[in-house]
Amino acid sequence: MLVLGIESSCDETGVALYDTERGLRAHCLHTQMAMHAEYGGVVPELASRDHIRRLVPLTEGCLAQAGASYGDIDAVAFTQGPGLGGALLAGSSYANALALALDKPVIPVHHLEGHLLSPLLAEEKPDFPFVALLVSGGHTQIMAVRGIGDYALLGESVDDAAGEAFDKTAKLLGLPYPGGAKLSELAESGRPEAFVFPRPMIHSDDLQMSFSGLKTAVLTAVEKVRAENGADDIPEQTRNDICRAFQDAVVDVLAAKVKKALLQTGFRTVVVAGGVGANRKLRETFGNMTVQIPTPKGKPKHPSEKVSVFFPPMAYCTDNGAMIAFAGAMHLGKGREVGAFNVRPRWPLSEIVR
């Protein structure tokens, strides 16, 4: 079956074709980054209007890539939520209208479930079960995944998402939009331990996380540097050092919490998905991850166990239509009820946890 996937939850318009027998056939994406940069952030009305302009050309581009026609489409999947209301409505309206015209089923998909399953698009796929870290601008959650549609929420950020903390910290440092990626780039030139920031909740017994306090620690450091220099500008090397210290703190917290999740579940496979999954430091740290099974006092320590870690291909870390087409195809194959026009801008992942 050939499933058309449509993603329009924020500032990327993604369209893709996934074949249940042949895999991903085509993937087209338009980012609105340049358009929103002028405003220092996403403008919802502009995002919605741009999605409307892009959906038809992107669909036709995907069909051309795959050597297919509208008549070959067996189902249409779209992001129902969460996201910006107007942006979601643009994708939902198009998906439902197209499905109606083609007399094909329409499949609503949870945006985060799309991210959760995106590593399954890679050539080397993880086996179930696994611990999933969903880490993006809007969400930071740790899930136990036992199969398609079989998810359990283990922990999440109680305030800012990790990606949101990256973007807000970048803004504090005067970096251009989108700041998170620029912060990561500058962190490569930062000196280790020139600054040391707290690792909030890293030692808590649960799997909850917090990043707002870390952002405050950066603000305090920035204000101190400016006061010492008697100027608003931050020296280039100092800025890079702050970027590195911030990034190291975030990655340390994420790694520590995922290790606790592995010990809690007994799983030895990790999947990292979402925009922050493209971060080089995070990939390096998780790629070398091991877990140490606790031993009773006085007993020999168990040897460390290597963890298998999977990331989606870089093209599928950010929002994209491929993950929506794939998730839709998986649900269609399991006989999920289809057909939905409404959108859900606020849609907790816990509501689809089985």
Curated annotation (Swiss-Prot):
Top-rank EC class of the record's enzyme: transferase
Swiss-Prot/TrEMBL catalytic activity: L-threonylcarbamoyladenylate + adenosine(37) in tRNA = N(6)-L-threonylcarbamoyladenosine(37) in tRNA + AMP + H(+)
The UniProt record lists the keyword Ligase: no
GO biological process, one term: tRNA threonylcarbamoyladenosine modification
Residues making up the signal peptide according to the UniProt record: none
Location(s) in or outside the cell: Cytoplasm
Molecular function terms from GO: iron ion binding; N(6)-L-threonylcarbamoyladenine synthase activity
GO CC annotation: cytoplasm
Entry note: cofactor: Binds 1 Fe(2+) ion per subunit.
Record-listed Fe cation binding positions: 111, 115, 319
Keywords recorded for this protein, A-Z: Acyltransferase, Cytoplasm, Iron, Metal-binding, Transferase, tRNA processing
One Pfam family of this chain: TsaD
SUPFAM superfamilies from the UniProt entry: Actin-like ATPase domain
HAMAP family per record: TsaD (MF_01445)
PANTHER family per the UniProt record, alphabetical: TRNA N6-ADENOSINE THREONYLCARBAMOYLTRANSFERASE, TRNA N6-ADENOSINE THREONYLCARBAMOYLTRANSFERASE, MITOCHONDRIAL
Family that this chain belongs to: Belongs to the KAE1 / TsaD family.
Protein name from the UniProt record: tRNA N6-adenosine threonylcarbamoyltransferase
Taxonomic source organism: Neisseria meningitidis
Lineage of producing organism: Bacteria, Pseudomonadati, Pseudomonadota, Betaproteobacteria, Neisseriales
Gene name of the encoded protein: tsaD
